[in-house]
Amino acid sequence: MEDERNTESHQGGEAAEQVEVKDRGLFDNLLGRKKDDQPEEKKHEEELVTGMEKVSVEEPKKEEHHAEGEKKESLLSKLHRSSSSSSSSSDEEEEVIDDNGEVVKRKKKKGLKEKIKEKLPGHKDHAGEHAPPPAATGFPAPAPPASVVTAAPTPAPAPVVTHGDHHHDTAVPVEKIEGDHAKTEATLPRAPEEEKKGFLDKIKEKLPGGHKKPEDATAVPPPAASPAAPATTPAPAHPPPATEEVSSPDGKEKKGILGKIMEKLPGYHKGSGEEDKTAAAATGEHKSSA
């Protein structure tokens, strides 16, 4: 029995070993296949990676080429624009190329003579015809300065003065307009204050009781008229009669004003004014009785 058991156990152990060996062989086969497949996959991956690297390397070269072309075009366009605008701004601006290769415009420094010429009204800027239009702003454009023309004043003719025996002619200026038409303006002589006083004295003399005493006349002589002033003959005054002045209701007021004026004049006494009042009252009574 023990021998059988030993043989069975020995057989069982061999079978297990075979199974294990087979299993190991299967794993080995699988692992071997995997190992064989790995180099192919690696080769394929390497090819893909190399292709991607080639593509990635080639693409930046194209972009750089395009960028260089654009830069060249921009420089050419700038040069073309500068050459086209150089005719308009050649007098005022200069084109200078910087270290970076960019074209920069700089304004020329104008001399004192050019500035003075620009300020003169007759100076015309030739570059203004080709200058670019000003930038559009909300404010209106300033109007050009209008030319100022000053007309020389016409000399006035000398006044003509003729001296007579008792009459002085005043100056009459004559102004010519447009060469054909003429206007004359005669200056009327103004009577001085002394002549006005003489006119009042004449009125007072015509009034009753307005005569001055001889002593007053000798004491205060009337001032002599200045020779330079033109002698004008006063118009003959027609004073109303004393009776009419008394009969009118406004006669008293008029007399009061005249009395005040007469009081202020030199050589006039109040007694003469009272005599005038008494005479006026007498004439009024005479009228009422009539």
Curated annotation (Swiss-Prot):
Pfam families: Dehydrin. Induction: Induced by cold stress. Induced by drought stress, salt stress and abscisic acid (ABA). Residues 1-290 are annotated as: Disordered. InterPro entries: Dehydrin, Dehydrin_CS. Belongs to the plant dehydrin family. The gene is DHN1. This is Dehydrin DHN1. Residues 90-101 have a biased composition (Acidic residues). Residues 226-235 have a biased composition (Low complexity). Expressed in panicles. It comes from Oryza sativa subsp. japonica. PANTHER family: DEHYDRIN ERD14, DEHYDRIN XERO 2-RELATED. Residues 131-145 have a biased composition (Pro residues). Residues 19-47, 55-75, 113-129, 163-184, 191-216, 271-290 have a biased composition (Basic and acidic residues). GO terms for biological process: cold acclimation; response to abscisic acid; response to water deprivation.
